[in-house]
């Protein structure tokens, strides 16, 4: 809930609404940090669940790079691009610079569709293919490209983009 939404509740002014938002955010961060330490990021569903609440209600498209070690444990993540309500731009070069700087063995790309529909666009498919090909050359595997929709929907693009994996 936002400060303005909380202020609509009788008896909650701006100061109290800000306090409540701060408490909610702190609780979310603590819970996420504890969960992060136990997660195996080799599973698309696990990754989608981990990022779902942060991404599904965003009004603009965000592309997140998830960098993993050789045991599929999270090294770090980074928002690589914030676009419009219909798209975002990021270069393959920027993605792999971050991955190499973090010494990632593999990566996962996530982005949200503000429309709530996780169906991939042609551009989503093209970007996935380009990142996959570059990763093969560089030696940093793209494990998945996940599209986050609304209402707990997500779509894994890795099998759509490459029907026959070696």
What are these regions (language model features)?
Residues 51-102, 106:
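Histidine/lysine/aspartate-rich catalytic loop segments that bind and position anionic ligands
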Residues 127-139:
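Alpha-helix-loop-beta-strand connector modules within alpha/beta enzyme cores
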Residues 91-93, 122-130:
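Charged helix-capping and loop-helix junction motifs
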Residues 158-164:
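Conserved small/polar residues in nucleotide/adenosyl-binding loops
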Residues 115-117, 123, 136:
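Surface-exposed, charge/polar-rich loops and edge strands
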Residues 105-115:
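Short acidic, glycine-rich surface-loop motifs adjacent to enzyme active sites
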Residues 27, 31-51:
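Long, charged amphipathic helices and adjacent flexible linkers at domain junctions
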């Amino acid at each position: 809930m936002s400060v303005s939404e909380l202020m609509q509740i009788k008896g909650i002014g701006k100061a109290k609404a800000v306090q409540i938002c701060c408490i909610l955010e702190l609780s979310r961060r603590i819970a996420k940090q504890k969960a992060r330490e136990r997660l195996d990021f080799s599973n698309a569903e696990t990754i989608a669940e981990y990022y779902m609440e942060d991404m599904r209600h965003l009004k603009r498209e965000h592309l997140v790079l998830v960098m993993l070690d050789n045991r599929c444990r999270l090294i770090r993540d980074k928002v690589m691009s914030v676009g419009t309500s219909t798209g975002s731009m990021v270069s393959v070069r920027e993605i792999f610079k971050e991955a190499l700087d973090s010494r990632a063995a593999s990566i996962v790309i996530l982005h949200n569709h503000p429309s709530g529909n996780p169906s991939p666009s042609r551009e989503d498919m093209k970007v996935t293919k380009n990142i996959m090909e570059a990763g093969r050359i560089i030696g940093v595997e793209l494990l998945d490209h996940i599209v986050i929709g609304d209402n707990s929907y997500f779509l894994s693009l890795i099998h759509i983009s490459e029907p026959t994996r070696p």
